[in-house]
Design a protein with these regions (language model features):
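Conserved beta-strand positions in repeat-built beta-propeller and related beta-rich domains
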Residues: 5-8, 15-16, 55-59, 65-66, ...
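Asp-box/WD-like beta-propeller blade repeats and closely related beta-sheet repeat scaffolds
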Residues: 83-181
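Surface-exposed loop and turn segments in beta-propeller and other repeat-based domains
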Residues: 89-91, 157-175, 257-294, 386-397
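Short loop/turn segments immediately following beta-strands, especially the blade-tip
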Residues: 25-30, 75-82, 145-155, 203-209, ...
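Short coil/turn segments that connect the beta-strands within blades of beta-propeller domains
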Residues: 1, 50-51, 105-107, 187-188, ...
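Loop/turn-rich, solvent-exposed surfaces of beta-rich toroidal or solenoidal domains
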Residues: 294-329, 337-359
Length: 397
């Protein structure tokens, strides 16, 4: 079994750039062993498809020109020993690319460009009163579609869709503008979680063009961050408040079925889930989301194994957790949460056989392996851990 770990190599926000690139590990059921470390620029998210690995380069100046955008890279995977070698790279045609995924037919690569929370272009313009006032222009947030060459390398850009708008906490808290965070595919449909706008955009792609067919409204202020698709169901994890929604897919479009907690019930006695009945907060409204109040939990990633749903929660004032939910009759049932030896769990994954859970703790720079109960899929014990500075995402094959 091989584990591929992306990392944060350049400090940004609360994240320290202690990583060097992509690290390859092996796991024999008992021990993790480091096999290879390949230097790359901010390969924060990675995905493995057979003998090819793709990663985002989550920066604003991938070409060396400040503000020119991030990048996306492709690697060949040696199936014999698990090692990797870069075969191509491209600009991502946007700032801070946050996710990469390959189409089901293997012919296209989709990349979401998140955009920066803080870096803006400032212009002073004259208003109707003849006064010069500051106008702040944020980075575009977009989804880019690339061709995939026969050898798996990244081909030409085929389409780029820029999404505008803002979310409930539009006066701060990371929702002043659109921020596409995650992209997933199912057949001819493309789904993007827009944590800056509280929406999920649904596209089809035909003749190398993307077409928007639905803008699914999520709970105002909740900031959809990650999603997983399992058959006819989609699980959407929110970043601003610890909750996960279950949607049903019908002809590619999303229809809400249920919403569930991702933390112990005692947490919500102190921090109940809010309900906002308008798309934008008042300017003087106190921001209660996790981006503004660090005492609150901030969900980070989601992984689905059969009917079991795993969620990681960042808790900067105490300790991070992994929570287990179960889907039953189109409902989500919270089962348990497990404390982690760190505050900032990022990527994680369940092994294909469902026996192990791998968790990346970004703040401590360690990867942990936990054994799962074969029947309940609850965490049984820690099996091993290993040092991996700045680790931010995992792929287990």
């Amino acid at each position: 079994m091989y584990i591929y770990a992306g990392s944060i190599t350049e400090s940004t926000g609360s994240l320290k750039g202690s990583g060097k690139g992509i690290t390859v590990f092996s796991f024999d059921g008992e021990h993790l062993q480091k096999l290879q470390e390949v230097e790359d620029v901010q390969p924060s998210i990675l995905k493995v498809y057979g003998d090819r690995l793709y990663c985002t380069n989550e920066v604003k100046d991938f070409t060396g020109l400040n503000g020119s955008g991030g990048g996306v890279s492709a690697y060949a995977v040696n199936k014999t020993d698990g090692t990797i070698q870069k075969i191509s790279q491209s600009i991502s045609y946007g700032s801070r690319p946050s996710y990469v995924v390959k189409s089901d037919d293997g012919k296209h690569l989709f990349v979401t460009n998140h955009g920066s929370h803080t870096t803006v272009t400032c212009h002073y313009i004259k208003n109707n009163l003849g006064q010069f006032v500051l106008e702040r222009q944020f980075d575009d947030s977009s989804v880019a579609m690339f061709a995939v060459q026969k050898d798996g390398s990244i081909g030409n850009l085929q389409d780029l869709q820029v999404i505008h708008g803002s979310g409930y906490w539009c006066h701060g808290g990371g929702q002043s503008t659109s921020h596409l965070h995650c992209v997933k595919t199912k057949g001819e449909y493309i789904y993007t979680c827009n944590r800056g706008k509280d929406t999920i955009e649904v596209f089809t792609y035909k003749n190398n063009r993307l077409q928007l067919i639905q803008e699914c409204q999520c709970p105002y202020g909740y900031a959809p961050r990650h999603m997983e698709i399992l058959g006819e169901y989609t699980f959407v994890l929110y970043e601003n408040y610890p909750a996960v929604s279950l949607f049903q897919l019908k002809q590619g479009k999303l229809y809400a079925l249920d919403i569930s907690i991702t933390m112990p019930k005692t947490y919500y006695d102190v921090y109940p889930l809010p309900h906002f009945d308008k798309p934008h907060a008042d300017k003087e409204e106190i921001n209660t989301c996790g981006m503004a109040d660090k005492r609150r939990a901030m969900p980070s990633d989601i992984h689905v194994f059969k009917e079991y749903v795993y969620v990681s929660n960042r808790c900067f004032s105490s300790f991070g957790t992994v929570s287990l939910l179960k889907m039953e009759k189109e409902k989500l049932a919270y089962t348990a949460s497990y404390a982690l030896p760190g505050k900032d769990p990022r990527g994680f994954a369940v092994s294909k056989d469902g026996n192990y859970l791998f968790v990346a703790l970004c703040d401590t720079g360690k990867i942990y392996v936990y054994a799962l109960d074969p029947l309940t899929k609850e965490i049984v014990k820690e099996v091993d851990h290993i040092y991996c500075p700045g680790v931010s995402s995992l792929a287990v094959v």
